[in-house]
């Protein structure tokens, strides 16, 4: 494991950081370091200590509790500062799938972000920004993680669509500030239409990518950003660590810089493409495992909420994050018409409606491993 207890690990770190009274970074130094792992802690354990839900752990790790508390305080300050500048935080439900030794799904649960995971996330984002800014001003060849401003036409289409639900976003000369999308996500939080509008907002934005030009990160509202913190699992981070080490040792001479100027554009294009391919493979694998899991529950009843509506039926999301479809052909009590503006199915005779966020009880009627889909039929409305 990368952080096994009682081991020393070589690393590169933004160290000797100084901050003013408002915790704004005023100075830093990036150097080679050695991480001394005194104790290996889990997110669950640290979160339990911070929330007070695990008193036994608080006593066992009493000398670390003040450190965790300071980390929590600093994390909150960093996150709030990011929020104020307009950073967008999509909080889509993620799945945690437990497999047996043969790769068969045993259980599926929602993966929940907690205080401990947010601390590490905030600190990693800050480290990434710090490294990106440092090497931008060194004017040496480098890899950046960039996220371009959304296409004006897509933002106009999003604006028209959300107006159907009573929301709006402000644009100026076809451009939008990330804070507008942040405010939209805040307004829809907890509403029945949140899953739909949040996904549409994400799809209306451009994909982040790796580039050699530091053009900023729209979603994070950051002027400088890179991927530095995960060299053991992401190639761009590893490439950056190589450049950093050469810079630290004074080896980035003219010849090496010319080498990187020729190499890095190819690295950026290839790693961006491979990242998209890996994400697609991950999504398809998750769908497959969910399909395999639900195949063991055909005929069983589950409670869920309607997460999407279309002219061919509606999707139902279960508490374990599995999503399946109730096909319109299974709604046999009436002839249902899809209202595209309100995202509702309404019965022509009885006027019964099925809409976003509506609780329903469903029976698993089938699965398709090839298509990676789950089919439901209604048991009865809640």
Where are these regions (language model features)?
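Conserved, carboxylate-rich catalytic/transport cores that coordinate ions
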Residues: 1-9, 15, 19-382
């Amino acid at each position: 494991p990368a952080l096994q207890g009682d081991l020393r690990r070589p690393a590169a770190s933004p160290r000797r950081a100084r901050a003013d009274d408002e915790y704004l970074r005023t100075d830093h130094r990036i150097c080679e370091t050695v991480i001394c792992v005194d104790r290996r802690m889990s997110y669950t354990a640290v979160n339990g200590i911070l929330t007070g839900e695990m008193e036994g752990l608080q006593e066992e790790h009493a000398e670390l509790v003040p450190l965790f508390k300071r980390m929590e305080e600093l994390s909150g300050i960093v996150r709030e500062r990011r929020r104020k500048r307009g950073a967008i935080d999509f909080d889509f439900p993620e799945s945690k799938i437990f497999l047996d030794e043969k790769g068969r799904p045993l259980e599926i649960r929602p993966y929940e972000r907690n205080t401990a995971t947010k601390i590490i996330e905030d600190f990693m984002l800050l480290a990434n920004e710090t490294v990106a800014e440092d090497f931008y001003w060194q004017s040496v060849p480098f890899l950046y993680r960039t996220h371009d401003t959304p296409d004006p036409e897509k933002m106009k289409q999003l604006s028209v669509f959300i107006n159907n639900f009573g929301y709006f976003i402000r644009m100026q000369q076809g451009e939008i500030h990330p804070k507008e999308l942040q405010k939209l996500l805040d307004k829809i939080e907890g509403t029945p239409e949140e899953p739909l509008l949040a996904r549409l907002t994400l799809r209306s934005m451009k994909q982040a990518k790796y580039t050699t030009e530091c053009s900023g990160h729209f979603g994070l509202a950051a002027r400088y950003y890179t991927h530095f913190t995960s060299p053991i699992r992401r190639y761009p981070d590893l490439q950056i660590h190589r450049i950093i080490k050469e810079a630290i040792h004074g080896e980035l001479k003219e010849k090496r810089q010319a080498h990187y100027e020729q190499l890095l554009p190819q690295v950026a294009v290839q790693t961006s493409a491979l990242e998209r391919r890996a994400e697609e493979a991950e999504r398809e694998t998750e769908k497959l495992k969910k399909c395999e899991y639900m195949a063991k529950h055909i005929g069983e009843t589950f409670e869920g909420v309607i997460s999407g509506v279309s002219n061919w039926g509606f999707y139902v999301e279960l508490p374990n994050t599995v999503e399946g479809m109730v096909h319109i052909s299974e709604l046999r009590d009436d002839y249902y018409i899809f209202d595209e503006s309100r995202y509702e199915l309404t019965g022509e005779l009885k006027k019964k409606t099925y809409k976003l966020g509506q609780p329903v009880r469903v029976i698993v009627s089938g699965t398709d491993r090839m298509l990676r889909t789950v089919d439901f039929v209604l048991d009865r409305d809640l």
